[in-house]
Amino acid sequence: MEKYFPKYVPFFSLLALSGLLYLLWSITSLESWNCQTVSTFYQLQNSIQSVLKTSELLLPTEFNYSFCAHLGQEPTLEEAREESYLLKSIAWPEPSTLGLPLRQSSDPAQSYYTIQDTGDLRVGGQLAVKVHMHNFLGQPKKHGGDFLVARLHTPELVAGVAGQVRDHNNGNYTIFFPLLWAGVAQVELTMIHSSEAVMVLKRLREEQSDRVFFKSLFRSGYISESTLCNPCLPLKPQPLCNYTDPQTGEPWYCYKPKMLDCDTRIDHSKGGYKKNLLTVYESQFFQSGVNIKVPIHSAGVDNVTVLPASKVRTKKMRLEFTPSGYYYQGSWRPLSGVVPRQFNTSSLINQCLRGKMLYMYGDSTVRQWYEYLITNVPEFKEFNFHSAKNVGPYMGVNMNYNALLKYRCHGPPIRFTSVSSAEMRYISNELDGLSGGSDTVVVISIWSHFSTYPVPVYIRRLRHIRKAVIRLLNREPTTLVFIRTGNLQKLDAESSLFNSDWFSQQLDTVLRAMFKGLNVQLVDAWEMTLAHHHPHQLHPQLDIVSNMVNFILSHICPVRKKKKRG
């Protein structure tokens, strides 16, 4: 009988697939899925999997079976088109030949850059730098895809600006810097990951989205159990608890406890990080000091002298890249939108925040701003909600100036130690509860905890937040809304697999595109950390945070234009 079984595999597969399609047809919407439905779905997909495993010929590659593809509300045609456009915009160049040995991968120690023109460089112009990537054999690379970042800086002036890297897909790159101050400026170039390492990161993002796992504690009386949770759970013949948000359709599932009901969940927490994610071959591309965040040096001079702008009126040069701002004398100077102000005393901050309500939503990088204001403005008194440390929610009230500060973390996934399930809120739902107005300031930061997931998961979350922001601005157009971008951080061989700057850069590109054209202010944390001399950290150092807060306060309390005398 066994020797005839393979020829019936297509029949059994078709039969199982028909049952699956019937089940999907009978489910009218995601919100109506209950625990029993989801569990049945799991068991049915498991049946399909077991049938397919009878013939290796039917499985040409190793698949990551999970529930991810079937979660979330169906996007509209317009949303699907936008998602397709966004994914194309972050498509990364791939090596023409995969599986090359380490010695043929990018070696920052043997790569170099050259400054194109050291002649008459003046403020208002630009600097072009050519980068030539070589492998460990000293041979020129023939393809692109290396992840490089660069800055131009003058230590004596505490000045710095980010550069734009252009990949020519042949092993060569061009970096453009705007020239924004006079003096001797030095080029600093870093290879964060080789193109070969990026291919590994792409695989992990698509195939191992549950490499950070979460858990929830369930309790009733003296009985307690913990189970794994995620929006993407590995297929198991085990019942699920469905915690999909009814307003947004954002999916979240936990395996059902063996002895308790789903409504006995009391918290959410980070479970941990998966180990042994890489093959021996892949691990070669993640070596600290060798090919992770290693500087690339110049083949000649590494600095230029920038002269003051010419007093003679000349045709304005077309710049290849215009950054959002730059540092000068340690202060961030935006290039558009607002005149920067320095709020160096609690008195200045108090005057600016008089009568204001600041609502901060998101991850720990925006919680930093809440903590900065609470620490530097003693008039703010915190309410004790007995919240877990570094989790929140937090609230500070300034009775003297009638001001309010609030911080709340975003909904799952979030890698905090322990969050009460009653406090798990989605940003879009919170925004819908705000009245808004000229006294309301909203600050949002959501990026770091999505680095391990396929990009469509992040797009879906931002889509809900964007809709809520639009609704808020329609209710009260005078509401100020700030969106914080992601930033660079410290990396090693292990953290690169979960928190790589490449993941953050991909999400950052998506975030900027999705909020472009809306009446929101972007706090460019990416450029503010790249242009600064401090080492990269997930939580930037105090003077960077100070510049970020000053940027926000400069928008809340802009410099008043002097009226012209008639």
From Swiss-Prot:
Pfam families xrefs: Neurexophilin (PF06312), NXPE4_C (PF24536)
InterPro entries referenced in this protein's UniProt entry, alphabetically: Ig_E-set, NXPE4_C, NXPH/NXPE
Secretion signal, residue range per the UniProt entry: 1-32
Keywords: Glycoprotein, Secreted, Signal
Glycosylated sites: 64, 172, 242, 303, 344
Family: Belongs to the NXPE family.
Protein name: NXPE family member 3
Organism: Danio rerio (Zebrafish)
Gene (name only): nxpe3
